[in-house]
Amino acid sequence: MSLQPHGGFLVQAFHPDKEITSIHKEIELDAISLSDLELIAIGGYSPIQGFLTQADYESVVEKSRLVSGIVWSIPITLPVTEEKAATLQPGEEVKLVYQGETFGVIQVADIFEPNKRKEALLVYGTEDLAHPGVHKLHERPAIYVGGKITLIKRLAQKFPTYSFDPVETRQLFASKGWQTIVGFQTRNPVHRAHEYIQKAALETIDGLFLNPLVGETKSDDVSAAIRMESYEILLKNYYPENRVQLGVFPAAMRYAGPREAIFHALVRKNYGCTHFIVGRDHAGVGDYYGTYDAQKIFEQFKEDELGIIPLKFEHSFYCQQCEGMATTKTCPHDSSAHIILSGTKVREMLRNGEVPPSTFSRKEVVDVLIKGMQKEVVK
């Protein structure tokens, strides 16, 4: 499998010396647009070079492809109010501002009103406003601005030790001598089921890139700071140091299930991964998606047009009779012997003051989660 970035090149659009004194118009970004701006500029979203124009947006929504035919499954858009849109013209440069600071510039290509109902149905598979992705879609302004961007100021890194651009992770993997790298996306603390599939992958892959998402998530997700501490202690105690690399993914969570699984895989390809783990209900929320829908969607695309190999794992569990982690492929016992693990269940137990057993998560990880969540409650 090629280590080429998606589309064949790594976008590099960080130019801190760009002259902006003559640019007077500005667009206020929200947290999602801000993280998207940086990820476009550092090549995380290659080959996208800006917020999607109408033609690319409609193609992505309808076909999971850019107009060029390159696979891309999540629309990366810049929403503005109708009032702001009325002041903008195609062809002009506009500053991209967040909380009073200019972070970038967009070369406006077009300004258009999206069909958000269609976007919700095709990208999220539902119009239900209780779905956090659909809710956020409709909460954001009504008009989209498309065009190439330039990043002129980097965001402050919440986790500088673990913050890497795709250029840096590629160099890092090469320096470790890794020929094959498997990416793992998570927004939850790593429980025993995660550990099991990660280590199963490591039996045949050179290195694991544990790449937790630390951008905007649902309010009931465990905070990034607590999760990062739990990842550190898990890797220190239970993983071979020379076979794993921890690095943060500063994107917002979309909760788009199958569509987001493709997106997550393509982004990890840009970071230098050759393989990507897709478990049960990847990027799902509630009961909106089938257990393995996020795996099945990969069958809609040819392996060479994705350029990254999905590793599809069945739902793993702790079997009391096997006395270890297993799946239905490796365990013959009845489901009554199985303890089903999930990030949702771990979160529920912690919030109810219950201590998850060692069959759920390592004791060291549980201790970190309990202490961290108690501190957050005190705040």
Curated annotation (Swiss-Prot):
Keywords: ATP-binding, Nucleotide-binding, Nucleotidyltransferase, Transferase. InterPro entries: ATP-Sase_PUA-like_dom, PUA-like_sf, Rossmann-like_a/b/a_fold, SO4_adenylyltransferase_pro, Sulfurylase_cat_dom, Sulphate_adenylyltransferase. One of its GO terms (molecular function) is ATP binding. It is an enzyme of class 2 (transferase). The keyword ATP-binding applies. One of its GO terms (biological process) is hydrogen sulfide biosynthetic process. Pathway: Sulfur metabolism; hydrogen sulfide biosynthesis; sulfite from sulfate: step 1/3. It catalyses: sulfate + ATP + H(+) = adenosine 5'-phosphosulfate + diphosphate. Its EC number is 2.7.7.4. It comes from the Bacteria. PANTHER family: PTHR43509, SULFATE ADENYLYLTRANSFERASE. This is Sulfate adenylyltransferase. The gene is sat.
